[in-house]
């Protein structure tokens, strides 16, 4: 997990050890530290407060183990958020990164289709659950199957039950399984 020194006016103010991965969390911690400095909090409060933060619900939230693999859930539903998630987990030492992703809304999937295709090539295996409609009906003729057809080695699952069955079949110790999306995949 990230650890770094906070430098203020050219001097070390605090040493921070985060419990959450990713450059985006380092940036958030630096913003929190800057606010604390502006409000005259002591260095110890910054160090202790940031060390005690274990993340927000559905943001790289550890759910347990499944067939020896570690399972984390994340709310990411936009290509930029997916990129941040994949960047955060890449150096964590897992043998394989398996992402079970459920796109959120037909309009977002259609509008960001090529960006989703690009970023979902990053995990070792992308499993595409069907799009979570939310407030929409499919008037665009788009499916997660369309994404899967553009991502080499990916798998399409029409239902969440199919996602679970596939994970049961392929998960093994050393894997990181990410359930990802703003719908009901978690």
Where are these regions (language model features)?
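Acidic-glycine-rich active-site phosphate/pyrophosphate-binding loop
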Residues: 1-14
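C-terminal accessory "lid"/substrate-recognition subdomains
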Residues: 5, 24-25
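ATP-dependent carboxylate-amine ligase
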Residues: 11, 21-24, 31-186
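Histidine-centered acyl-transfer/condensation active-site motif
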Residues: 17-18
């Amino acid at each position: 997990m990230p650890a770094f020194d906070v430098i203020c006016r050219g001097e070390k103010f605090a040493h921070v050890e985060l419990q959450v991965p990713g450059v985006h969390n380092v940036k958030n911690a630096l913003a929190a530290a800057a606010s604390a400095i502006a409000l005259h909090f002591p260095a110890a409060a910054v160090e202790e407060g940031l060390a005690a933060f274990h993340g927000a619900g559905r943001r790289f939230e550890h759910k347990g183990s499944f067939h020896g693999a570690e399972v984390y859930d994340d709310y990411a539903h936009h290509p930029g958020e997916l990129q941040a998630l994949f960047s955060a987990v890449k150096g964590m030492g897992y043998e394989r990164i398996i992402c079970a992703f459920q796109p959120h809304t037909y309009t977002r999937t259609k509008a960001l289709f090529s960006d989703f295709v690009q970023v979902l090539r990053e995990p070792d295996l992308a499993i595409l659950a069907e799009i979570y409609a939310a407030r929409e009906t499919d008037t665009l003729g788009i499916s997660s199957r369309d994404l899967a057809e553009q991502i080499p080695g990916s798998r399409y699952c029409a239902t969440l039950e199919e996602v679970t069955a596939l994970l049961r079949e392929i998960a093994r110790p050393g894997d990181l399984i990410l359930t990802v999306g703003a719908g009901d995949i978690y």
